[in-house]
A protein has these predicted regions:
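Enzymes that bind and transform nitrogen-containing heteroaromatic metabolites
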Residues: 1-207
């Protein structure tokens, strides 16, 4: 998930016009489009909130395409939203039951792509194994925070840092267990394979099936 330096994923009204922000960092890496495409094929399904879904749908309506391919996409919402694709399904029940009872048995790599409420709930409920966070070189002052509704501290382990020529920095954190160790023993190896995801395809909270 891409965010401003001050931790916002969108403006208060949902606009993300600042996502095209870039700078010049001579020592940074250049994203490999081929690697991004290969990486996206490893994702089994996406989970998102209604605001993220509406933003993605608006991008598609303006000719930018659907960012999530033909992968199953689950939208967490209690609102009556238009279903624009056959791969989209809406859900409004208990999140823990949905993830553990329905998604984990079917999918190995489950990616929560926002927004702030969904990402925060995923962490708060102990569902996440990994958090990926792409920081753009801009401060917007106000907006929708990366994580909302957190009621406790969540200890993390920094597994990977990647800086790009555009000035974007990508961070990957493993979510630690109750004793401080990373919850996913194979996460370090996975992180190295997934280090070059570009900002257009950055995703937030990652779950893996045991």
């Amino acid at each position: 998930m891409a965010a401003s330096l001050d931790g916002f994923i969108a403006r208060k009204d949902g606009r993300v016009d600042w996502l095209e922000t870039s700078d010049e960092f001579a020592d940074g890496d250049t994203p490999d489009p081929g690697f991004v495409e290969t990486f996206l094929k490893t994702i089994d399904c996406y989970v998102m909130g209604s605001r993220t879904y509406e933003t993605a749908s608006s991008f598609e309506a303006r000719g930018f395409g659907w960012s999530y391919g033909d992968k199953p996409t689950f939208v967490l919402t209690s609102r009556d939203l238009p279903r624009t694709r056959d791969t989209v399904e809406f859900y409004s029940g208990d999140l823990v039951q949905f993830v553990n009872g329905r998604l984990r048995p079917r999918f190995r790599a489950i990616w929560f792509v926002g927004g702030g409420v969904v990402s925060g709930e995923c962490l708060r409920l102990g569902l996440a194994d990994e958090v990926r966070y792409s920081i753009l070189p801009i401060v917007i002052g106000h907006g929708i925070p990366f994580f909302e509704r957190l009621d406790r501290d969540i200890p993390l382990h920094l597994a990977e840092v990647k800086a790009y020529k555009s000035g974007m920095v990508e961070l990957c954190y493993e979510v630690r267990g109750h004793r401080g160790e990373p919850r996913n023993a194979t996460c370090q190896q996975q992180v190295r394979r997934m280090a070059q995801v570009s900002v257009l395809h950055s995703v937030g909270v990652h779950l893996t099936r045991s």
